[in-house]
């Protein structure tokens, strides 16, 4: 019989799940959430939107196709921890360079396996997301990694989870945004679009480039004047982690540029547009995370299966003067999934049309963005209005 090093997951509500260590040996704390995707664990781990969170994968067996550098969504994992019913110690994939555990050890991802993930997910769906701690016995008791944690030790970790800072009200983007602007290399000249990086995924940049956009990625704190000085044809507000409410600098930028540039927002970018227009956001009970969320397009009547990762949503009824109208809704719970400005070429979706991982039903939105840019430029004769430059002091 193979002996396994012990580990626990301690939640702030006092629940303790006992399992086995996997990945980097240590301790970690974060907000515990779950993702229903069957594949794509590497993309999930390296998505900056998961910064500050411990992710539970509902699919029971994870890791059997290893890790391929081409599937990274950023330059490193951003998850605080990873949870699965069972991780695979072996892998089979001609594209892979290493096993999932070797990848976790390389980047310091603390994980746990062997717990009842179905029970954990039911707990999160019923009671909402909670803070939690993963602790490895080998980290605290290297002399006896196979022993059990005592009840007193478990309560220490429960208290540590309770004491951990909430994601609510905390600006998580400053930990993931690019420190300096950069241009994404493309094979052809296209429409110059400024991408505000709140935690952008590589695949989003690639999809924009594929439809004829020259992406210029800028830090989250970039001012409207700095953006307009780049003479862009459009503006893109990216995905990112955490609560959108504290990002007042981003709300201000989005508000000042609204109507001056065709604008497309995804995920956190969608929420920022809602707040910029005077609306409100709210934290969801357990959010939407997975590659199988049904969304209805209210403009066409079509249903799209979408990839999602968000714990906050926009209350469109709170946006004054009907500035935005709903374009997409979630068929599971009726929450807003997309909106468009009633007067300006500004639109956004709460989900991820680039997928990675997930279905490709909504990739048409990138083409729509180019169409909005072309129409705006044709109507105004220039990608940058003289009036806008004067308004911003450029």
Swiss-Prot record:
Gene3D superfamilies: 3.40.50.880, Carbamoyl-phosphate synthase small subunit, N-terminal domain. Keywords: Amino-acid biosynthesis, Arginine biosynthesis, ATP-binding, Glutamine amidotransferase, Ligase, Nucleotide-binding, Pyrimidine biosynthesis. It catalyses: hydrogencarbonate + L-glutamine + 2 ATP + H2O = carbamoyl phosphate + L-glutamate + 2 ADP + phosphate + 2 H(+). It is an enzyme of class 6 (ligase). GO terms for biological process: 'de novo' pyrimidine nucleobase biosynthetic process; 'de novo' UMP biosynthetic process; glutamine metabolic process; L-arginine biosynthetic process. Pathway: Amino-acid biosynthesis; L-arginine biosynthesis; carbamoyl phosphate from bicarbonate: step 1/1; Pyrimidine metabolism; UMP biosynthesis via de novo pathway; (S)-dihydroorotate from bicarbonate: step 1/3. Pfam families: CPSase_sm_chain (PF00988), GATase (PF00117). GO terms for molecular function: ATP binding; carbamoyl-phosphate synthase (glutamine-hydrolyzing) activity; glutaminase activity. InterPro entries: Anth_synth/Amidotransfase, CarbamoylP_synth_ssu, CarbamoylP_synth_ssu_N, CarbP_synth_ssu_N_sf, Class_I_gatase-like, CPSase_GATase1, GATASE. Residues 1-188 are annotated as: CPSase. L-glutamine binds at residues 49, 240, 242, 268, 271, 309, 311-312. Residues 192-379 form the Glutamine amidotransferase type-1 domain. The active site is at 267 (nucleophile), 352, 354. Its EC number is 6.3.5.5. Composed of two chains; the small (or glutamine) chain promotes the hydrolysis of glutamine to ammonia, which is used by the large (or ammonia) chain to synthesize carbamoyl phosphate. Tetramer of heterodimers (alpha,beta)4. Belongs to the CarA family. PANTHER family: CARBAMOYL-PHOSPHATE SYNTHASE SMALL CHAIN, MULTIFUNCTIONAL TRYPTOPHAN BIOSYNTHESIS PROTEIN-RELATED. This is Carbamoyl phosphate synthase small chain. The gene is carA.
């Amino acid at each position: 019989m193979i002996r396994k090093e012990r580990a626990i997951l301690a939640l702030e509500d006092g629940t303790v799940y006992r399992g086995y260590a996997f990945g980097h040996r240590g301790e970690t704390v974060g907000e515990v959430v779950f993702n229903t995707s069957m594949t794509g664990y590497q993309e999930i781990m390296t998505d900056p939107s998961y910064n500050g969170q411990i992710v539970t994968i509902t699919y029971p067996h994870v890791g059997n196709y290893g890790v391929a550098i081409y599937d990274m969504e950023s330059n490193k994992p951003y998850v605080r921890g990873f949870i699965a019913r069972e991780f695979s110690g072996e892998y089979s994939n001609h594209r892979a360079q290493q096993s999932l555990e070797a990848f976790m050890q390389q980047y310091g991802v603390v994980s746990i396996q062997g717990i009842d993930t179905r029970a954990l997910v039911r707990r999160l769906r019923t009671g909402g997301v909670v803070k939690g701690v993963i602790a490895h016995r080998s980290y605290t008791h290297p002399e006896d990694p196979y022993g059990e944690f005592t009840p007193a030790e478990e309560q220490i970790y429960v208290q540590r989870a309770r004491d951990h800072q909430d994601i609510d009200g905390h600006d998580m983007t400053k930990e993931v945004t690019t420190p300096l602007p950069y241009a994404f290399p493309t094979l052809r000249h296209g429409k110059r679009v400024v991408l505000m990086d709140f935690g952008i995924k590589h695949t989003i940049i690639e999809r924009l480039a594929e439809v004829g956009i020259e992406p210029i990625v800028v830090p989250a704190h970039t001012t409207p004047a700095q953006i307009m000085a780049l003479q862009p044809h459009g503006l893109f507000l990216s995905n990112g982690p955490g609560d959108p409410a504290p990002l007042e600098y981003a709300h201000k930028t989005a508000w000042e540029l609204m109507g001056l540039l065709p604008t497309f927002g995804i995920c956190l970018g969608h929420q920022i547009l809602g707040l910029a227009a005077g609306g409100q956001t709210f934290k969801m009970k357990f959010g939407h995370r997975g590659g199988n969320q049904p969304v209805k397009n209210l403009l066409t009547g079509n249903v799209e299966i979408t990839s999602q990762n968000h714990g906050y949503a926009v209350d469109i009824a709170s946006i004054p003067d009907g500035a935005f109208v709903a374009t997409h809704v979630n068929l599971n719970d009726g929450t807003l999934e997309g909106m468009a400005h009633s007067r300006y070429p500004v639109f956004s979706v709460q989900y991820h049309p680039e997928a990675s991982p997930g279905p490709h039903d909504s990739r048409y939105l990138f083409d729509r963005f180019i169409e909005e840019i072309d129409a705006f430029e044709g109507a105004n004769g220039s990608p940058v209005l003289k009036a806008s430059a004067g308004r911003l002091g450029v």
